[in-house]
């Protein structure tokens, strides 16, 4: 493995270690608004949602790795689960350069759509993981934590839109995950395949949200001075 690959792996392991430490000690990102009073500056709002989105993505990564360790033992099984994600039909920037070309208010509403669209599959993930044999509390607890933190993230993105681009409020794309398979009455392997794909796609979307918010924080809150 080259030095760059080693550094990336070390960085991922460090993030997972921090995530586990924070989770076990019940240390969470600051709330977006305290006691319903939101006088937070735009810059601070961006700082908080970026920390929160990164925390959520780290929890997804942690859960995905743990799910594979628990249930996926061979590569043939993993190949079966590589399907398109439900949000693949949403036109999203592929990298930072493309993201910078998208009007900020459009990108914010796209982020909002991705965060909103995760609610139903997250709920199904929680009920689905609880229904498989020997379901580890470790995975279930992280799914529930993500569900709660997602509500905070949604609130934060909505506050940013209201402050920075009030005219764009309500212009988001209402996107629903279609073809969410029923997990009732299916065999154990099919259930695991479905749940793994759900986690993979949610993790993919959370990575997009995290990256887009970092681009927007630099662009809006720091006037591209970062």
UniProtKB/Swiss-Prot annotation:
Keywords: Disulfide bond, Hormone, Lactation, Phosphoprotein, Secreted, Signal
Main location: secreted
One Pfam family hit: Hormone_1
One CC-aspect GO term: secretory granule
Keyword Secreted assigned: yes
Endpoints of the signal sequence: 1-29
GO molecular function: hormone activity; prolactin receptor binding
Modified residue annotations for Phosphoserine: 53, 117
Disulfide bond positions: 33-38, 85-201, 218-226
Location of this chain's protein in the cell: Secreted
Gene3D superfamilies in the record: 1.20.1250.10
GO terms of biological process kind: cell population proliferation; epithelial cell proliferation; lactation; mammary gland development; maternal behavior; positive regulation of cell population proliferation; positive regulation of epithelial cell proliferation; positive regulation of receptor signaling pathway via JAK-STAT
Binding partners and assembly: Interacts with PRLR.
Function: Prolactin acts primarily on the mammary gland by promoting lactation.
Family: Belongs to the somatotropin/prolactin family.
Protein name, as recorded: Prolactin
Organism lineage: Eukaryota, Metazoa, Chordata, Craniata, Vertebrata
UniProt gene name: Prl
């Amino acid at each position: 493995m080259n030095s760059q690959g080693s550094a990336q792996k070390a960085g991922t392991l460090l993030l997972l270690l921090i995530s586990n430490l924070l989770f076990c000690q019940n240390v969470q990102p600051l709330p977006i608004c305290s006691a319903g009073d939101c006088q937070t500056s735009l810059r601070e709002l961006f700082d908080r949602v970026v920390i929160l989105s990164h925390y959520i993505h780290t929890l997804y990564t942690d859960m995905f790795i743990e799910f594979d360790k628990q249930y996926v033992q061979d590569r043939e099984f993993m190949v079966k689960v590589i399907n398109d994600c439900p949000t693949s039909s949403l036109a999203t920037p592929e990298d930072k350069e493309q993201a910078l070309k998208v009007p900020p208010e459009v990108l914010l509403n796209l982020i909002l759509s991705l965060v909103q669209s995760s609610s139903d599959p997250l709920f199904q993930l929680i009920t689905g993981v609880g229904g498989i044999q020997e379901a580890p509390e470790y995975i279930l607890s992280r799914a529930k934590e993500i569900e709660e933190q997602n509500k905070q993230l949604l609130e934060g993105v909505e506050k940013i839109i209201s402050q920075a681009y009030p005219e764009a409020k309500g212009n988001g794309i209402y996107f629903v995950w279609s073809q969410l398979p029923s997990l009732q009455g299916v065999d154990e392997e099919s259930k695991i395949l479905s749940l793994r794909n759900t986690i993979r796609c949610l993790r993919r979307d959370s990575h997009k949200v995290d990256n887009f918010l970092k681009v927007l924080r630099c662009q809006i809150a720091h006037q591209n001075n970062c």
